[in-house]
Amino acid sequence: TGEWRVLADQLRAPVGAGYALENRLAMARMLGGLQTRLNIERHAPFFAAFRDGLAARCRRAEPRIVLLTPGRFTPSYAEQAHLAPYLGFPLAEGGDLAVLDDRVYLRTIAGLKRVDALWHRVDPRLIDPLAFDSHSGVGVPGLVDAMAADEVVVTNSPGAGMLEAPAFAAFLPRLCTRLTGANLLLANIATWWCGQGRGRNGVAGHLDNMLIAPAFGVATNVLADGVAVLGSDMPDAQRAALLADFERRPQDYVGREVVRLSTMPVVGENGLA
């Protein structure tokens, strides 16, 4: 029967919610009232909760929340341009914002308007040319100082992407239970970090049933391209090199459960496939 599982986490600039919304709206137009009659769960409550959650972190009762985009040349710009008006957020590029006395302002034809929160879709390394990459043309100079002064709320704050590392997936179930007293609502793929003796020994003893991946998303001595590989597909030489590197730098690796992904029929040029 199958079940839903989380394959990976996106925290730096999550993409996809806007595409789901666009797809739902397009399907609603095509199917007429069929979705309503089938009692399909609406997307609106999710976006309302997201918007209200951001607003709750702001000081003002009616905060101004801005979606910060890298600009129209980013691949997900269409999604951002669709999401912003749906949520009631101005869509702004770095040049549309200014930081004065550690406060963030939006440039408008009516003058500067205070910004209470930013939902940013910019690479964190480019978000503030004064704090990170000085060559960035898409960031907001002084934004990090405004964050440090607690004058603006930034969701997907710089550094959040660290939690995308596969190594953290090994601890999510226990962290969730410890912090919330409940299990994960949607289970992730079972993951074992080799930086712990028990995890390393378990992965080494079951290589043929594991997906071996870099623990922190970067190349390792054995996975030079930083891409995960099935243990069962490893040549003998690579397998020996991996086991040797487990002794030298076990913290660089994770073993992940191999899952069988679902498929669904599609209609193409040659009919149903």
What are these regions (language model features)?
Residues 1-5, 9-273:
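Domain-scale recognition of functional cores that engage charged ligands
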